[in-house]
């Protein structure tokens, strides 16, 4: 099977489509699928368009959607709104505002911010009736695996023999059976760091991930460009056991796309 693989489109439908066009996705007459390694929304202004596009592919059995931390954040934001924190969120005092999850919810529900704050119960109801919540989120999986690759968002779950502030990570051979809490944590990991510094890899396979800007890996492990500077290299990062794809689309105006046959 041929897989076109992207990560972190973050609500930029046109950039995603452009990447797929350049890779030959739409002209490919052989069986193929799109793998999205998480974070569909929360940056761009084309939330509805990207959701409709992915669901169209899903209806043709052409989509594999891996859950990212921003998929978790969407659900958590609605829970926090329902608990009465809508004013804090809308006023910018919450990570839901800084992460742009609040803005994605407004886009999908087509509610004005003041109306959403004044009628937060209606906002939650409308958000839970969007195609993203009802149709796309249920398609998410923690990871996808082929003979030679594992596709995830941050990284695979690991064992932490330290604590939250001084972690000591090691490979967990039973990571596939990790519970929901550990998968949620794994979606926040920096895969490049775990692979290149901690040596945590899947034996015999390459892990393809997103979540963290690839300029981090290029700068820290290759000595190329900057990290969060004027000379960031945001192309895919390749190293032993890892391919990282998050191209920081909000800055680069591109979505990284690779093609894998396996």
Regions found by a protein language model. Name each.
Residues 1-53, 58:
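N-terminal active-site segment of His-dependent metallophosphoesterases
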Residues 16, 46, 75-77, 161-162, ...:
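Short glycine-/acidic-enriched loop or helix-start segments at secondary-structure transitions
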Residues 259-262:
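Short beta-strand-to-coil "C-cap" segments at the C-terminal boundary of structured domains/repeats
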Residues 6-7, 34-38, 65-69, 152, ...:
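Active-site neighborhood of phospho(di)ester-bond hydrolases with catalytic His/Asp-centered motifs
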Residues 44, 48-51, 56-142, 147, ...:
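Active-site neighborhood of divalent metal-dependent phosphoester bond hydrolases
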Residues 29-31, 60-62, 147, 202-205:
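A general structural motif
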Residues 10-12, 42, 71-72, 156, ...:
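Short, glycine/acidic-enriched loop or turn micro-motifs at the edges of active sites
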Residues 107-243, 249-253:
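Acidic, His/Gly-enriched loop-helix segments that form or flank divalent-metal centers
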């Amino acid at each position: 099977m041929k897989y076109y693989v992207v990560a972190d489109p973050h609500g930029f439908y046109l950039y995603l489509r452009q990447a797929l066009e350049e890779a030959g996705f739409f002209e490919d007459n052989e069986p193929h699928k799109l793998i999205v390694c998480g974070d569909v929304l929360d940056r761009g202004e084309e939330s509805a368009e990207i959701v409709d596009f992915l669901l169209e592919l899903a209806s043709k059995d052409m989509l594999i959607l891996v859950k990212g931390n921003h998929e978790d954040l969407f659900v958590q934001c609605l829970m926090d709104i329902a608990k009465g924190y809508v004013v804090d969120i809308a006023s910018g005092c919450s990570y839901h505002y800084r992460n742009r999850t609040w803005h994605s919810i407004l886009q999908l529900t087509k509610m004005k911010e003041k109306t959403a704050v004044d009628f937060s119960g209606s906002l939650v109801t409308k958000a839970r009736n969007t195609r993203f919540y009802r149709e796309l989120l249920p398609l998410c999986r923690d990871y996808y695996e082929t003979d030679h690759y594992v596709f995830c968002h941050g990284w695979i779950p690991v064992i932490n023999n330290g604590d939250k502030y001084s972690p000591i990570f090691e490979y967990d051979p039973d990571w596939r059976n990790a519970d929901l809490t550990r998968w949620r944590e794994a979606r926040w990991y920096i895969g490049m760091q775990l692979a290149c510094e901690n040596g945590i890899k899947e034996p015999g396979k390459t892990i393809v991930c997103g979540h963290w800007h690839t300029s981090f890996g290029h700068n820290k492990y290759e000595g190329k460009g900057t990290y969060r500077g004027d000379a960031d290299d945001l192309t895919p990062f390749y190293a032993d056991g890892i391919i990282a794809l998050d191209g920081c689309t909000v800055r680069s105006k591109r979505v990284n796309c690779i093609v894998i046959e396996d």
